[in-house]
Amino acid sequence: LPLYRQEAIYARDQVEIDRSQMAQWMGKLGFELEPLADYALARIKQGERVFADETTLPTLAPGSGKAKTAYLWTYVRDDRPFGGSGPPIVAYRFEDSRAGECVARHLDGYRGILQVDGYAAYNRLARSDRGNDGVMLAACWSHVRRKFYELHAAGSSVIASQTVAQMAP
């Protein structure tokens, strides 16, 4: 919830908390929680499978008052569907960029299966010339199905229609 909205909610209840004070609290909280966030990502990288995705996150550019696009990278480990007993873990990383350098830095040292949506930035991890040749990319079934469905809906491929029929639940 944006701080300006929190400030308004508190004000309705006659609690005056300045937005700049809340921003300072958020900064301090982020600093204090950083070791926990690093631990979560380290545990995720110990798994055989990691699911990754990135999403846009509008943020205010300091001093300009205008929004810019930043990215929230998400990394998930959940071995329960594969017989694992550990709890699911999620880690987030904030970046100003969607470049492959971000995911390479976040998952440095990871070896295993990386399930992603097909965005080219992830290819960097699977290329042997990038130093992370122990990563095997796995496509997201939903994203793959969408491509077949688009061909099926356009009526341009019998094979795509057959594939969609086989993928249907």
What are these model-derived regions, one by one?
Residues L1-P169:
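Catalytic center-proximal scaffold of phosphoryl-transfer enzymes
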